[in-house]
Amino acid sequence: RLPPGIAAVTAERGRGKSALAGMLLRQLGGEAIVTAPTRSAVEVLASFAGETLRFMAPDALLASKEKAAWLIVDEAAAIPAPLLRQLVSRFPRTLLTTTVQGYEGTGRGFLLKFCASLPHLQSFTLSAPIRWAAGCPLESAISQLLIFNDEAFRDAPMGEIALEAVNQSCWQTQPALPEAMYQLLSGAHYRTSPLDLRRMMDAPGQAFRCARAGGAVAGAL
């Protein structure tokens, strides 16, 4: 049992951090409140927690006088820092989870900025997958197919900006360009899903614009 304080768990997308939080919640019984940017964001957590889930939206929780031994915040980096700071101050023990990919991958900055300001924070990284066996080739294949990697956009492209129209046919003729656009959009938008990738590939009525700087994708619309 963790002593009073705040713990943060980071992991790559799909590694199982929400499942891990759900397992903890099942053990805690009714001793915890769960919050997240949206109710749908805790579906995986809820499937592992069983009937013990007590969810409240962040603003509703802050406005209430609810008390619990634990506060579990899933996708914590997607909650505004001032609101999150008020929430964690209300509970004796808080577990924060965030991914290091996609929009919620602001979790990298979340750890450096928000968590760095918290005294006695215990930080953990979930490296062993819960959904997969370690080194499972299926995980690597799915990550590649669904374009989960957004590491290319850690540094902003430099140079003169050039705008161009991009057609859906580029997925067949020049796939690297729409892939880079999707990676950028995924990293900049909250809860991008594989359905968004499918729509970008084949949904009718789509129009795309790309901004390039020094040959690299700097913007996408």
Show where each model-derived region lies:
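Conserved RecA-like ASCE ATPase "motif II neighborhood" in helicase/translocase motors
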Residues: 51-89
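Pre-Walker A (Motif I) flank of P-loop NTPase domains
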Residues: 2-7, 206-207
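Signature of the SF2 helicase/ATPase Hel1-core->accessory helical subdomain module
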Residues: 81-121
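Conserved helicase/translocase motor-coupling segment
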Residues: 164-220
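Conserved coupling/interface region of RecA-like P-loop/ASCE motor cores
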Residues: 115-154
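Hydrophobic positions on the alpha1 helix immediately C-terminal to the Walker A/P-loop
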Residues: 20, 24
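Conserved lysine of the Walker
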Residues: 17
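Conserved RecA-like ASCE P-loop NTPase motor core of nucleic-acid helicases/translocases
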Residues: 7-8, 30-42
